[in-house]
């Protein structure tokens, strides 16, 4: 745990008692603060009280006693409308912040020789894979590495800092909205496509949240920016004009005079005086697909930005074990392979997996994002058949009508059974792909639970009396 500095003998209100809120409360107390916790769920309040926390009804509280409101990132800050705790805090002149901001202030308050290196990663898609990959590169190069934020442990739950440590942090747009003091040594912005627009009031608000990650960078820091979409290209152009830091563009499809890029799966380093061919990403078994070329370029650049050697960075790419729920093979029965890409919670993320296979039996659906699957129409000819689940099943069937055969499966378990039956009947080598292009909250607690349900459904299938074998 990282004890939070700057709130000694002050009281901080904490709203939202999930993993982030409880971890922040513990870290605040460890740093000498007092806390007043609240959640709208009685079970969460009871669990906090059982742990010994002061549970205070923030609706009835005197807000003048609070030095700050620590808001969990899932709670609306501004859109569709500010949460009532935010309105009360603002009315009382109480600042609203998140756990990443508490971490940033604690780092900034530490003596220079005790401050760790910080690599911060954001983007619409690929954040978790890239964060885990950077963590692996740093750790395999011998650095004392801690990985967290929007992946794994909340940032304040990581081991306490020292000058030789490297913190690799995945940051969502929600977290960035609540952060103003973070100064990363290296920032990675992978890509931007429409997502979470209801929480940011539209595309401009979403982009503004992502841009906050660069807010405090200056001389000696590095900005690593994907330039394969127009929004990130514009950000790269604007930040380059500011000329305050080192900027390395990254691309998964075009050669550049400066930066790191991949062409046909080969990684090139153009950060020095000449372009160097450094790795064949196609040899990295846990980085399949063109989208992972960008992830590899970003991770390599981030590792190099904090002084890891070219060879150590390349070695790390080749030994990366991969992440669950990201194009993860969970089993094979006969000629049918089952791929879990449950992390694909929007159409752009699903595109990455769908583009990797010439033909597949597609399981999709859940809570659709803006635009649904309209942007995937160019990939519909690859769909052998679609099996639709959750709230989006019927709308998705309308989009697919006349373009790809589909069935309303309803549940994930039924979809797996139907997809396996059809794939096995084809007699060919086949892929059953769970890449939902949707959030999971209509039927599951999160994408991980959805992915585990897919794994369980696959394991529940039999072929000649045997369970699915992990390929």
UniProtKB/Swiss-Prot annotation:
Q: What UniProt keywords are attached to this protein's entry?
A: ATP-binding, Cell cycle, Cell division, Cell shape, Cell wall biogenesis/degradation, Cytoplasm, Ligase, Nucleotide-binding, Peptidoglycan synthesis
GO MF annotations in UniProt: ATP binding; UDP-N-acetylmuramoylalanine-D-glutamate ligase activity
**Pfam families the record matches:** Mur_ligase_C, Mur_ligase_M, MurD-like_N
TM spans (from-to)? none
Catalytic activity from the UniProt record: UDP-N-acetyl-alpha-D-muramoyl-L-alanine + D-glutamate + ATP = UDP-N-acetyl-alpha-D-muramoyl-L-alanyl-D-glutamate + ADP + phosphate + H(+)
Assigned EC number: 6.3.2.9
> Which residues are noted in the entry as ATP-binding?
123-129
Its annotated pathway reads: Cell wall biogenesis; peptidoglycan biosynthesis
Class of enzymatic activity (EC top level): ligase
- Leader sequence segment: none
Does the record carry rRNA-binding as a key word?
no
The subcellular localization recorded is: Cytoplasm
One GO BP annotation of this record:
peptidoglycan biosynthetic process
Which InterPro entries would you find in this protein's record?
Answer: Mur-like_cat_sf, Mur_ligase_C, Mur_ligase_C_dom_sf, Mur_ligase_cen, MurD
The name this protein carries in UniProt is UDP-N-acetylmuramoylalanine--D-glutamate ligase
Supply the source organism for this entry.
Caulobacter vibrioides (strain NA1000 / CB15N)
């Amino acid at each position: 745990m990282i004890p939070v500095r700057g709130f000694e003998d002050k009281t901080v209100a904490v709203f939202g008692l999930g993993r982030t809120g409880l971890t922040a409360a513990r870290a605040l107390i460890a740093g000498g603060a007092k806390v007043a916790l609240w959640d709208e769920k009685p079970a969460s309040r009871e669990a906090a009280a059982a742990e010994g926390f002061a549970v205070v009804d923030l609706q009835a509280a005197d807000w003048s006693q609070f030095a700050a409101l620590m808001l969990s990132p899932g709670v609306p800050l501004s859109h569709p409308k500010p949460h009532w705790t935010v309105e009360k805090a603002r009315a009382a002149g109480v600042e609203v912040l998140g756990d990443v901001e508490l971490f940033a202030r604690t780092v900034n308050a530490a003596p220079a020789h005790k401050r760790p290196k910080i690599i911060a990663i954001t983007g619409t898609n690929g954040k978790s894979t890239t964060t885990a990959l950077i963590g692996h590169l740093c750790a395999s190069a011998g650095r004392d590495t801690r990985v967290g934020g929007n992946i794994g442990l909340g940032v304040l739950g990581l081991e306490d800092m020292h000058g030789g440590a490297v913190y690799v942090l995945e940051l969502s747009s929600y977290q960035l909205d609540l952060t103003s003091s973070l100064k990363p040594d290296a920032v990675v912005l992978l890509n931007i496509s429409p997502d979470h627009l209801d929480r940011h009031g539209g595309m401009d608000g979403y982009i503004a949240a992502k841009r906050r990650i660069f807010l405090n960078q200056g001389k000696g820091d590095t900005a690593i920016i994907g330039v394969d979409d127009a929004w990130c290209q514009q950000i790269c152009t604007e930040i380059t004009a500011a000329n305050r830091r080192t900027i390395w563009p990254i691309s998964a499809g075009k050669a550049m005079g400066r930066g790191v890029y991949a062409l046909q799966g080969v990684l090139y380093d153009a950060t020095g005086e000449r372009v160097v061919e450094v790795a064949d990403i196609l040899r990295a078994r846990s980085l399949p697909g063109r989208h992972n070329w960008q992830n590899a370029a970003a991770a390599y650049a981030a590792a190099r930005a904090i002084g890891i050697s070219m060879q150590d960075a390349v070695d790390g790419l080749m030994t990366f074990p991969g992440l669950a729920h990201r194009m993860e093979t969970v089993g094979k029965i006969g000629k049918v392979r089952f791929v879990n890409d449950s992390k694909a919670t929007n159409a752009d993320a699903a595109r990455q997996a769908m583009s990797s296979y010439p033909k597949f039996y597609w399981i999709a659906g859940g809570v659709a994002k803006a635009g649904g699957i309209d942007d995937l129409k160019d990939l519909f000819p690859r769909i052998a058949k679609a099996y639709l689940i959750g709230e989006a099943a019927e709308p998705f069937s309308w989009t697919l009508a006349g373009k790809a055969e589909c069935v309303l499966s309803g549940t994930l378990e039924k979809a797996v059974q139907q997809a396996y039956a059809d794939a096995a009947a084809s007699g060919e080598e086949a892929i059953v792909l769970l890449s939902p292009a949707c959030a999971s909250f209509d039927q599951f607690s999160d994408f991980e639970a959805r992915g585990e349900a897919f794994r369980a459904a696959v394991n529940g299938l039999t072929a000649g009396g045997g369970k699915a074998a992990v390929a």
